[in-house]
Every structure is written in C-alpha cells, then in structure tokens.
Amino acid sequence: MKVAVIGAGSMGGMHANLLGAMDEVDEIFIVEADATRAEAVAMRAGGSVATFERALAEADAIIVATPPELHRVAVGAAIDVGRHVLCEKPLTESLASTIELTRHVEKAGTHVELGFQRRHDAGFRAAREAATGRLHLVRLTAHDPLVTPRPAPSGPPPEVAPIFRDSSIHDFDVVRWLTGQEVTEVSVEAGRRDGSRPTDPREIESAVVSMQLSGGTLAVLEASWLHPRGYDIRIELVSDETATTGGLSPRTPSRHADWPDATDGWSGYLERFEPAYRAELVAFLAASRGEGSPASTARDGLEAMRIAVAATRSFREARHVALDEIAGLARSQVA
C-alpha cells in the first residue's frame, strides 16, 4: 500500500515511523509545509516528500496529522477523491465545522477514522471485555505531565476548553466505547495549579467531569495537566458482577503507598501508547483494503466534541448541562 501522512509534527512523525516498519506499506508520502521537517521525517521513515496533490492522486490511504484547524480541508479533499482517512483528534477545531465535516464524510461514503488509539490499547480492550453484567460506574484517570504554565488568555473565551478539546476528548470517546451508551448530562469542577478557580476555559489545568449515561451508568473523569511524575491514563469499570481496571502497570507514575514505588513511570503519550498506535494503524490499513470495519467514525469524533462543548458550558455556567442542549447531527441530516 501507498500511504500519505499529512503533517510532520510529533504525531505525523510517529505515524510515519510506524508505517516504515510495516511490511504491507510499500511507499510513504510526507506532506509538510516545513521542508526541513518533511525531509527529516521522510528520511527516518524511509519515505519521500510529496505535494498534497500528489499524495491525493497516488496514495491508497491518508493520515491527517495537521493542526486541527486544517483538518476540514485535508480530510474533505481526501474523501472527495475516494480515499479512506485516519484523522488525528479532534476531527476539527470547532463544533460547527465538525458537524459540517461529518455531514460531508457520511454523504461521501468513504470512511474517516479518528485517532482514538485508546480503543486499541490492550488493557482497555481487556477491561471492556471483562466488564460483564450491569455497569454501574466508570472511572477515568487522565493525568498529563506537569507543563510550563500557559500565557494568560486574551481575547474572547473559546467554545471549548483546551484541556477538553485536546486531551479529554479521548476520555469522552472512551466512555462511549466502553459502555455502548451515550452521555446525556455533564457537570464540571475545575482548578488551577495555584489553587484558584479558573475564570476562563483556557485557564483550566485540572478538572473533574461527572457524566450521566443513557443506560443509567455514571462516569467520572479526573483530568489534569499537573501530574508531577509522568503520564497516567487508567480506567475502572464496576458492574454488578465485576470490577475491572485497565491501564495499571509497574510503570504507572504514582507513588504506591502500599507497595514499592514505581521507578520508571510513563513519560508521555507516545511511549505509553506506542503499541496501541501501531495496532490502530494495522487496523486502519486493513479497513482501507476492505478487510475489516473502521474502529471509529467521524460521528464518534462529533459526539466526543459535543461532550467537550457541554463540559465547557458546564464550567462556564456552573450548572449541569444536558447533551440535548448541544448542536449535533441527526442521521436524517446526512443527505
């Protein structure tokens, strides 16, 4: 297969490197505005630098790993020539453009898979399979390493908080995938590293997101950009028959008071989820050849974005927000 990677940042570079080690991939095209970066990524992956037009014409499948504001154009162009696409999350930068692109994708009939690699994580998949019985509670832990404080926000506040759009969107997808239920209501408490309450969505550095699901299950997400020891992503599912955890390992970057301390915690998402990213690519390429179904769809990207918008509104208005309040796309609106 010939595969094009659009965007050669950290995600595009990672995808290119993994593709370069796959026997089924014959050629890799790297499309990137920064010529120096494009050449470096192409050299590491054993690919070649190409124009966007050549990539669309010659590639069998397209991976879009540009900044979110460029996704709509890249994905739209790819599906217009019948290419299957793996698009990094979020599907686009805003709810309105996500609705528009989802409509475009579903009308075109090609498949667009989102980069929700946690669906391919071995521990998450095992936990999902093990959670038999009536599911009562889902707990999601999503802690990113402590980062340098962001500049003070300026201009009008965004529709969706960066922490929800860029990080928690994975968790919003996972809770739907784990349970087979839709999120119906969201409430949020948020914090900052100095202990004060954020007043702008861009100031949120930690949050607790409570979610009511359509089947009666409750879900709680603990999200943070302030973990002092590394990258900690876990799930716990409690039903009337089982209690199952996924994501725990000797490298979970938390000081364990009840047993010896972990000494080599996960440092970031590329290290923690490399096997899942590889499995994601294998499944995507198989689906592109007609040998399976995509693991996720554009509509999954839309639903995750709707939850992120609802969470931001809950923060801003200090109330529970029903998902019915957030614009979406009914099946009848595809044509």
Describe each region flagged by the PLM.
Residues 1-44:
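N-terminal Rossmann-like dinucleotide-binding module
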Residues 15, 47-102:
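Beta-loop-alpha module in the N-terminal Rossmann-like domain of NAD(P)-dependent dehydrogenases
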Residues 33, 269-282, 296:
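Active-site loop of classical SDR/Rossmann-like NAD(P)-dependent oxidoreductases
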Residues 61-64, 286-335:
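C-terminal helix-rich "cap/oligomerization" subdomain common to oxidoreductases
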Residues 64, 87, 112-114, 221, ...:
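Hydrophobic residues in well-ordered beta-strands that form the structural core
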Residues 100-118, 134-140:
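Rossmann-fold dehydrogenase core element
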Residues 118-200, 318:
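Predominantly a Rossmann-like dinucleotide-binding segment in NAD(P)-dependent oxidoreductases
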Residues 173-251, 278-291, 328-335:
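Contiguous beta-strand/loop segments that form the cofactor/metal-binding neighborhood of enzyme cores
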